[in-house]
Design a protein with these regions (language model features):
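N-terminal pre-Walker A segment at the start of P-loop NTPase domains
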Residues: 422-449
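Conserved P-loop NTPase motor module
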Residues: 533, 548, 561-624, 631-650, ...
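The start of beta-strands in P-loop NTPase/AAA+ ATPase cores
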Residues: 77, 159, 488, 617, ...
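Extended, folded cores of ATP/NTP-driven motor/assembly subunits in large transport
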Residues: 2-421
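Anion (oxyanion) recognition and catalysis
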Residues: 187, 372, 482-483, 503, ...
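Switch/coupling segment of Walker-type NTPase motor domains
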Residues: 87-89, 118-133, 140, 147-154, ...
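Conserved P-loop NTPase motor cores
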Residues: 442-443, 448-480, 486-498, 508-516, ...
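Hydrophobic positions in the central parallel beta-sheet of the AAA+
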Residues: 81, 619-621, 657
Length: 816
């Protein structure tokens, strides 16, 4: 037993200044009582390196009749718990502290039961569920396939707690007490005891986590059933294992496949440890098991250890401060109030896994890099790799690098972090819109909807400065959403940003004026319904701004005349102009410009309205020039929004209404009124409005801040290095969320976004950082390019090769 008497980090800081964001862990070498037993572990308790029948050395004997308790060969008892975990990535400080105190209380409470505890965090590749898709477009199918290929290396972290108690009087009673404390203290983490009966799935069996670490290749899922002794051990091991002795490498083999495992321990650390270190380690691009071994010591035993060490320090130390620090530690374990802490015997190890030596060496280098950022020194375990491997199982309780810590310190190391996973379905149908990676490498199933329930709110607001990729993300999400075959997408565009993608999916890119005009409009060329009649009356009043009683009667007479006295081909505004409006009335005077060819007469007087919303699944409207004319903008917006609402009402099909660069459009009263109405009523029509802004406070300047924040239950924030706290003040961000926006965190992921849903998860909220780097699309990323240079290139390719062939030529670089 070796000693280091610089106790300030371990005890004094642990008692006085627990910070959860940048937390004092005080682990390993910088001020601790260490019990380093590396030199004391021999082959007498472990199989020889050449052995491959690991079943011979497993401790398990049987699963008891309660379906939850394992009995070991040495008479000890084991109980296993699954922890769902919580996402505290952007939680508020009071929530983080509350969850931290729950973990600390759990450790303190089980100290009186004198049980051994192991915590597994098993990080394995996640297989993405087959995502329903019926795009109806070959290019969308190819994009989706390419995106799936880029997500082959995504991971899931699973947490397990394993309690074990040696064969002694009241062993089961102590195990039950510890189990009750574990469930009570960690209830908010989503904890459940693992249980097996005839009908339960194998993943719920108490043997399942042990099977996972024993079989990293084949990943079988056996059940214990009534297997006893060696039969149970054989059942749990389907793979061979070889402790090579070659620089600590362990080999698993199953058939022709081999998996390499490397064990890494913690040799020393600096004074401070951020919880972010553990989070970063469990985000590395590799499979691994993080093993925490802890034995919370019963107070009399802890007291005896500390008093003995204090006496030794008195005799050997030249510093009176060292002795007083022991007194502080003794005070902590004796305290009966909130300052009480238990003394814990603790170790942390990593077992990294890979299909090649290169993979595990990469993982080792990443662990080294991350740990050293936090002044921690990891070490590859060589000849004690075998011991570290067997430390995963009850009965093998002699750890290679074991240290004493106070419970607050250990509680910081075992955070049970679990990043949000998104939703598998929405009101629009089965499957996610798309899947993104989180910062831990786990898959996140993106939906616009806040829940999977029927008619859930799906409105979304995107905030980010220019040049961050908002248009690219919008068009990508629009295309991915078209996996729902009945979905209609309406994209309000400016400066032709979505034109390339629209033409790729064979959608309609609609221009209303000038050289880009390609549609003929006639609001009266429509079915005779009450809704259409009401709209036309209101539309006539809005484009003339005539509100007097005579104008009201004239508008009603014109609509009645159109549907009851004119043939369909005669229903035009110019045919109603003289017959329905008084020469001396204000409405006739104001309507003149809408029939005069020199003004707006050619806009809404077509023989046939060619704006086809029923035959096109993707329609983009180019509003670049329309907004240069306030009068034309109001008339056009109101008509288009009416057509969209009518289509949704008549078909019942879901609709995605995407408004790129929303702020300039909201300056127009007619658009603003329709936009707010859509946010308020769109949910009932299965509509999702997506709006995008460059500045976070522009919505308040435009007078729609409360409506946007209140109705857009999904918020996406791009980074903004020029951000000020004042500009984001009304978005109710946490400190860590704002740190991300300002660019202080996740700097190694330049294409990350913050997805925030304050009302998700039954009001508990959701906040997750997603990697939206679309580089995995390869050449298909060009389909989302919004630069005018590429738009003009596509225009020329269409003229030369036609609508059918231009995409291939464009992707091949023709004309570039």
């Amino acid at each position: 037993m070796s000693l280091n008497f610089d106790f300030y980090t371990l005890f004094m800081e642990g008692l006085q200044s627990i910070e959860v964001f940048v937390a004092l862990l005080g682990i390993i070498a910088a001020g601790l009582i260490s019990v380093s037993l590396v030199s004391k572990i021999g082959a007498k308790v472990l199989p020889q390196p050449s052995e491959s029948r690991v079943a011979d050395f497993l401790p398990f004997d049987r699963l008891l009749s309660d379906g939850t308790t394992l009995r070991c060969s040495n008479g000890s008892y084991v109980r296993v718990f699954k922890i769902d975990g919580v996402d505290l990535t952007a939680a508020r400080e009071e929530v983080i502290m509350s969850m931290f105190e729950a973990r600390k209380s759990w450790i303190d409470n089980i100290s009186s039961t004198q049980v051994n505890c192991r915590i597994y965090t098993i990080r394995e590749r996640a297989e993405l569920a087959e995502n329903k898709s019926n795009f109806g477009n070959p290019w969308l199918e190819k994009v989706d396939g390419k995106w799936k290929e880029s997500l082959t290396r995504v991971y899931k972290n699973d947490h397990y707690i394993i309690l074990s108690v040696p064969d002694r009087k009241d062993a089961i009673k102590d195990l039950n007490t510890a189990s009750q404390s574990t469930i009570a203290n960690l209830n908010d983490y989503g904890i459940r005891v693992m249980y097996e009966d005839e009908n339960s799935p194998a993943e719920q069996s108490p043997i399942y986590p042990f099977v996972r670490v024993l079989n990293p290749i084949s990943k079988p899922k056996p059940k214990a059933r009534k297997a006893v002794g060696f039969q149970l051990k054989e059942l749990m091991t389907s793979e061979g294992i070889h402790f090579t002795g070659e620089e600590g490498i362990i080999k698993f083999f199953s058939g022709t496949k081999t998996k390499y495992v490397l064990t890494i321990g913690i040799r020393s650390s600096g004074d401070y440890m951020d919880e972010a270190m553990v989070s970063s380690l469990m985000s590395i691009d590799c499979e691994m098991t993080m093993l925490h071994s802890l034995v919370p010591l019963y107070t009399p035993k802890a007291r005896a250890i500390l008093m003995q060490q204090q006496k030794m320090a008195t005799a050997t130390s030249f510093s009176s401060g060292v002795v007083s620090q022991y007194s502080e530690a003794l005070s902590a374990i004796e305290d009966s109030d909130a300052d009480h802490q238990s003394l814990v015997q603790y170790s942390m190890n990593f077992l990294v896994k890979g299909d090649s030596l290169e993979e595990i060496e990469f993982a080792e280098s990443e662990i080294q890099r991350i740990c050293r950022l936090f002044s921690v020194t990891p070490v590859r375990e060589n000849w004690i790799a075998q011991a570290t491997f067997f430390n995963q199982f009850p009965g093998y309780d002699t750890c290679g690098r074991t240290y004493f810590y106070l419970s607050r310190i250990v509680a910081l190391a075992v955070s049970f972090e679990q990043i949000s996973t998104g939703l598998p379905r929405s009101d629009w149908g089965e499957g996610a819109i798309t899947v993104f990676r989180t910062m831990t490498g786990s898959p996140y199933r993106f939906q616009f909807h806040i829940t999977a329930g029927e008619a859930a709110v799906a409105h979304c607001c995107i905030v980010g400065p220019t040049g961050q990729g908002k248009t690219t993300l919008l068009t990508f999400l629009a295309g991915q959403a078209m996996r729902h075959e009945d979905l209609k997408v309406y994209f309000f565009d400016r400066h032709r940003g979505a034109e390339i993608f629209t033409r790729t999916v064979r959608g309609a890119y609609v221009g209303f004026s000038g050289e880009r005009k390609n549609v003929s409009l006639n609001p009266f060329d429509t079915r005779d319904t009450r809704s259409n009649r009401d709209f036309l009356r209101n539309w006539l009043r809005s484009i003339t701004m005539a509100t007097d009683a005579l104008s009201e009667r004239e508008a009603s007479r014109a609509v009645t005349t159109a549907f009851e006295y004119l043939r369909p081909e005669e229903r035009k505004l110019k045919n109603l102009y003289k017959s329905c409006f008084s020469p001396t009335g204000s409405m006739r005077r104001e309507l003149y410009r809408w029939i005069n060819p020199e003004q707006y007469g050619n806009i809404f007087n077509a023989d046939h309205d060619s704006l086809d919303l029923s035959g096109n699944r993707f329609v983009a409207f180019d509003f670049t020039e329309i907004f240069d004319d306030d009068v034309l903008a109001a008339a056009s917006i109101s008509y288009i929004m009416h057509r969209i609402q009518s289509e949704s009402t008549e078909t019942g099909s879901p609709a995605l209404i995407m408004i790129d660069e929303t702020a300039p459009m909201l300056k127009h009263e007619m658009f603003r009124d329709n936009f707010i109405k859509g946010l308020q009523e769109g949910r009932k029509k299965r509509q999702a409005y997506l709006c995008a802004f460059q500045q976070p406070n522009i919505v308040d300047t435009l007078g729609v801040g409360d409506a946007v924040r209140g109705q857009c239950k999904t918020m996406i924030f791009f980074r903004n290095t020029q951000a000020t706290p004042e500009s984001y003040e009304k978005w109710n961000l946490t400190a860590s969320e704002y740190d991300f926006i300002e660019g202080r965190t996740y700097r190694d992921c330049p294409y990350a976004i913050l997805l925030k849903r304050p009302d998700a998860d039954d009001g508990r909220g959701e906040s997750v950082i997603l990697d939206v780097n679309l580089g995995g699309l390869g050449p298909y990323l060009k389909l989302y390019n919004s630069s005018i240079k590429n738009v003009l290139l596509v225009e020329s390719l269409i003229r030369e090769y036609g609508e059918e062939a231009f995409v291939t030529k464009y992707l091949e670089g023709f004309g570039g």
